[in-house]
Amino acid sequence: MQFLSLNLLLLLPFVAGDLAPQPEPLRAGPSDVVPGQYIVTLKEGLSSAQIRDHKKWVNSVHRANLDSFAAGASGVETEGIMKHFHIHNLNMYSGGFDEKTAEELSRNPYVKSVHPDQHVYLAKTVTQPQARWGLGYMSSKGKPVPLHSTLVDYLYDDKAGEGVWAYVLDTGINVNHVEFEGRGILGHNAIPNKPHTDEFGHGTYVAGIIAGKTYGVAKKANVVSAKAFDTGSSTYNYILETYDWIVRNITDSNRKNKAVINLSISGAKYQPFDDAVENAFKAGITTVVAAGNDGKDAKNNTPASSPNAITVGAVRWENTRPSFSNYGKIVDIWAPGELIKSCWKGSNTATSTQSGTSAASPHVAGLVAYLMSFENLPSPSAVTARVLNLTIPNLVKDAKDSPNRVVYNGIQERKFTLPKDY
């Protein structure tokens, strides 16, 4: 293997103070609930025949209640079972039901839980003037990185994510962007009547941090577009469909040890999706998630609260926590998340500089892809242990009660000749 050094010229017209993206909600209020739509989780251990019989029962109850109470006249969605999700040992379905049917479902002996569907939000970002300090930070062992007109080396192994797939559950990816060099793949589009493109920009931006030739941590990795958002929000009906597709695609393609999922999304605590991420972990699949941008404890957010996801908070170039970044004991690691330049919407060469934990999470997802390309990491537990073992401790100012560990790619410990004075 060879070792590579990428010189990054950091140009910024001015230094802004702490950025403050609009916060995502911590709890599901009335505006977050999707009226008449539910996510039903079944108990583990049911046979295929039991699940089939249960769904027949659901359909009969739903039809009877529609006939008895004319639920469809209320304008609430009551179309019955909509989509089915199977992630490892977890069986779920979404559906449009009247309240009486939902109550009957909750009492069924095969049902673990019935939750109203909710809106979920992209971990929001703030646009600022262009900068590229984040990559240099990845190989600097947490050494503060100058922001103004300064050359910073990003040092990395030339395997650089080769032969690894990063799945981006987001707004889609412009796979034709020059940064992806043909490594972008259109995977799944859950949004009905919308093309599999990225008109919002967020997914392309995230993918560029993972695997862009200029802006990416893992410059040779493949990025797979899994579109569950069309704008800044979506629902678990689409998100679970997309996450289910990702897990099946990774499993069917026999690439569990060569794949990572990035979720730069955030919403109120939602146990059904935390359960989905946990079951993907049990199935052998690594998921990296944003801590969220509320400036509060990430334990109240999903998917940040998923116990076996890698939860990522944002750090600034001088090792301070931006005021927007969530924190707490659930945060595993800190990564660059302010003034990060990457790909953008609008053209195949467009770029944008943004801030938020949406930028921090793909730095770590990129690191996972990078390490998978040349290390034997046989399980998500091994991946997490390796990523955390490489971190540099006790550098983040105002980390509150979070584990104080900043991201590092381990290059200085590898047997290479480093540049003088690095």
Curated annotation (Swiss-Prot):
Its main location: secreted. Keywords: Glycoprotein, Hydrolase, Protease, Secreted, Serine protease, Signal, Virulence, Zymogen. Residues 1-17 form the signal peptide. Pfam families: Inhibitor_I9, Peptidase_S8. The keyword Hydrolase applies. It is found in: Secreted. The keyword Secreted applies. Residues 37-123 form the Inhibitor I9 domain. Gene3D superfamilies: Peptidase S8 propeptide/proteinase inhibitor I9, Peptidase S8/S53 domain. Glycans are attached at residues 249, 262, 389. Its EC number is 3.4.21.-. One of its GO terms (cellular component) is extracellular region. GO terms for biological process: proteolysis. SUPFAM superfamilies: Subtilisin-like (SSF52743). Residues 132-422 form the Peptidase S8 domain. The active site is at residues 170, 202, 358. Residues 18-123 form a propeptide. One of its GO terms (molecular function) is serine-type endopeptidase activity. Belongs to the peptidase S8 family. Secreted subtilisin-like serine protease with keratinolytic activity that contributes to pathogenicity. This is Subtilisin-like protease 2. It comes from Arthroderma gypseum (strain ATCC MYA-4604 / CBS 118893) (Microsporum gypseum). The lineage of its organism: Eukaryota, Fungi, Dikarya, Ascomycota, Pezizomycotina. The gene is SUB2.
